[in-house]
Amino acid sequence: MKTTYSYTVLRYVHDTTTGEFVNVGVALLAPEARYVSALCRTTYGRLGKVFPGMNGESFKSLMRFIQSRFEEMGTKFREELPLEKVPPSVMPLAHSVLPADDSSLQWAEPGGGITDDPSGTLENIFSRMVTRYDEAPQYERRSDDDVWRKFKRGFESRHVLHRLQPKKIQDAG
């Protein structure tokens, strides 16, 4: 069933004078589906590169708090009788979790659309607006010789290296 939704992006504004920001979360409300949830950044690596000197642990703690508050609201909306009117926009809910003030975390103007999968839409918006420019983790590749050097030291220290013989294994094909 298609349902309308509204969303807002949570921005981290390091210096309100310059107005520079990085998107750090997304909250979404689909009133007819009685769905509300949020996704927030759980790492601060990119933020630390853009704004050196920020307190990463405090940031992560605050992101967990915001996301958990939206999860609590989502549970309440799904499981309780619909006695209270659900707001038509996500903004009143967003401001109930994080009020509009001049702090570093600010809600952007809301957007919206129609979806048949509010959860999937939230993930898509989060991917597009928050994690789009994140660097993929870099894994260090090592050659066979690099790996052998590490193990060789251990074998040498235990005086068992002389007992090892090379062996070539071939497949049955």
Give a label for each model feature.
Residues 1-173:
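Polybasic/polar functional segments that serve as interface/processing modules
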